[in-house]
Amino acid sequence: MKKNLLSAIFIASSIATMAQIPFPVKIDTSWSSKTIWMPKSPLKQQVLFVGGVDTVQTTATYGNAAGATVAKQWHDFIGFTPETDPAKIATGDLGWVIVNHEMVEKNDKVGDGGGMTTFKLRRVTGNVMEIVPQTLTDGRSGKFFNVDFANTVGETGMNCGGISADNGRIWTAEEWFQSSNTQIAGGVRDTSDFVIGTTTPAGFPGFNGKTIKKYQNLNWMVEVDPKTGKAIRKQYNWGRAGYEGGVLMNDNKTVYLFEDGTPGLLIKFVANTAGDFTSGQLYAHKADAADKWIPIENNLDTLINLKSVAFKRGATMYTRLEWGAVNKTNGKIYITETGNDNPGSAFKSGLGATGTIANHLVLAYKNRYQIVNGTSFPGTDAAASDSVRNGAFKDYYGRVLELDPTTGVVRTFFEGGPYHTASASQGVNSYPNVHFSNPDGLNFAYIKGKTYMIMQEDLNGRTWNRMPAEYQAGTQTICESYLLDMDIANPTYSDLMRITACSPGAEITGGIAIDSRTMLFNVQHPDGANTFPYNNSLTYAISGWDGLTTAVEEYFKSKNNSLFTAYPNPVANELTLNKVSDIAIYDMTGKRVKVYRDVQVVNVSDLTPGAYLIMNADGERVKIIVQ
């Protein structure tokens, strides 16, 4: 994975090694060979929004007049609300983009706690984007607007993931779970009790006038309006937890929520009326229950303490659920479970004492046991479950889960990896070409009849091969985003196609396809020593996917070829061999240009357009044409 990092943001070339490989300096180029076309990528990368640099328009807050200030940093989730006005669509207006800021701080202008920024996006000539100047209903004018939480629903915090529904409705998730006013005092100045319904016109039916501790007004899903730059309501009836994200189903009634915790919850809410999420029934997932879900009553005390209530009733325990998305092709939900290097006693004591161990974690532990010990786990599934409960499963890489909403069954879709048997990572020269770890962001792209899963990493660490041995400093961390062709049966990490990566020291997140042409991504908390603007959190677009479909399809198809061949990844300017090989690259005069040892992925971004021959140590050849 990290061996050849090539992306629209960060490019690291592979290292050519000339020693100990018996390739002649000159060859006869008249031999016939298979021709591989390396098309010029039609993709265009464009930075749209830079934290700490771009200016956001603010509302009157804490006695300060409305005005402007620099945007917050730590960009995370991206939501998108499509434009529906035909006249605006005809001028290129795409819709409203809204970005979470996971940074928590006291701020006189944008409000304390976390935050969000909203802006409108337009596509102009080709795939060039521009930010649309707007005047909002509250009179603010400009390009970027702070979302007002402080004057509407009370301060928010830890804005991490969220829900970006197909119908344009947006919820932001307040992830980092808070247990006292002392915990929040560093980022929220007013820790006095909060009365529900005092700052929003509609409040929340059934809970208006209820008094709660200030910290208890954090860790909810919060609906926001990107068009007005204001929060609408905290979703008290969905329960209070360390939510990372969720999905709204096509029935416009059913919501699934994912908690980033060890143990973490999988929650479902079903509205009584489509589109009205102020009334309905809440459930927690319990895999061993007959109907897979246990009901949670709509009582404020219960909802505030959802985690302890659900686990006391035997809810299934997950290892840090992150983002999820509905695959509109098959109707199933896919959820990232990022893993935990050292769960310790989290599944055994406290909240975990009465929760149920997830079946897929038992299976993952048994598979790991087989790899490490060379023999099957000797005990029963119950014994393996006890091992997981006792903290024996060090979940270094995480996985992607599949939830079937018709049955309530959760299974592993594919595991991260490959597993490395030592804490010390391999060096670059022996590092695997694909190493997928700690999945976080997840979404889907639908391009010319094909369905692709978009995934992003947020590494929990750099050991255990999550970064090569030479790149173990925090400022050297590189997280990547991948595509997976959903037509592949029983996929593994080896089926992934790298599409972009973040600048050093950051995580890549927010990935969303706003249509068949453009994907948006965020880079969060990069190393401050990076070149501007990549030393800031930022939002960027990669456009032109509709012109790349054939090349992407060929990439996935060619990976199963048993003969010596190569297949292009024009997204990342990489040429991937179908097996690890020693190779030499020759120009069409027969002159040796490059030699590589033990490689499977070759950087071709520095080759001038033209024809070349690739020869392996067995003398097998393929011809590539770089456009």
Where are these regions (language model features)?
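Sequence/structural signature of beta-propeller domains
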Residues: 20-549
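Intrinsically disordered/low-complexity terminal segments and short unstructured peptides
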Residues: 16, 353-355, 521, 549, ...
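C-terminal outer-membrane/trafficking sorting elements
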Residues: 8, 555-567, 571-627
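Bacterial Sec-dependent N-terminal signal peptides
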Residues: 1-20, 613
